């Protein structure tokens, strides 16, 4: 029986140190392993860092995309209905697309620009029809979309802008964080991404109703994580038993574990240095493959 082959180029390097290890140990010592106060503290820090009103942590970036799409069906005035068209780039990770298909939406693919690997703007504009209800923009491999142009395309139209920012945490467009240009944005903290929380994802929004819907859908559709006055059920009962077992929406269980929240608090402090190092790595590869006869590399926008 042969042992595992060690890769020449690892997928990612470890960015944890004593701070993350101490955070994990503190959770172990507390005896509270499921989603709790550390996750809540991370969500507050995450929202503050990226300039959003609300952040909801989940167990992966893929779960963030699923929850984000689901939430658009469960507001009082739904943003989406089955059969609506949603425009997406032709290049992304699979779980950008699968939630759209799972909710009965018509996925409209737009080809990407060969240099930036984001949606080619003239093709994006041409893809918009009266049936288009959302654009799900993906900031691929650190490159931001041209949100000025995209917002011009949808100005005056009933089209929702969403962002899959799982691969571009820390990128900005016009000094505004990517993930915050649309109604909602998703992030990933998988171990090879900009921050590593073992597994993890996050959604940001400034919309209070969507925030409440996300909280409900994230954990079984129950009401126990909602504030007393909320936009899903109105006013909650003061009876804790009643609210602990009241299910208002057809939810999932996408909760993160408490350790991931604790690690995220420490990783978020280091994010600027992580982004800086990744930019240096990107510049190195751009130089290395410049004018290569067989390899075309993504160009920074």
Predicted segments, located by residue:
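N-terminal "arm"/small-domain region of PLP-dependent enzymes with the aminotransferase-like
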Residues: 1-32, 37, 248
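Phosphate-binding glycine-rich loop
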Residues: 32, 36-85, 99-103, 109-111, ...
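PLP-dependent aminotransferase class I/II
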Residues: 39-44, 52-56, 61-62, 122, ...
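PLP-dependent aminotransferase-like
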Residues: 74-140, 144-165, 172
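Phosphate-coordinating loops and pocket residues in cytosolic domains that bind phosphorylated ligands
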Residues: 102, 180, 216
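Conserved active-site segment immediately N-terminal to the catalytic lysine
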Residues: 163-197, 212, 243-246
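Adenylate-forming
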Residues: 197-200, 262-264
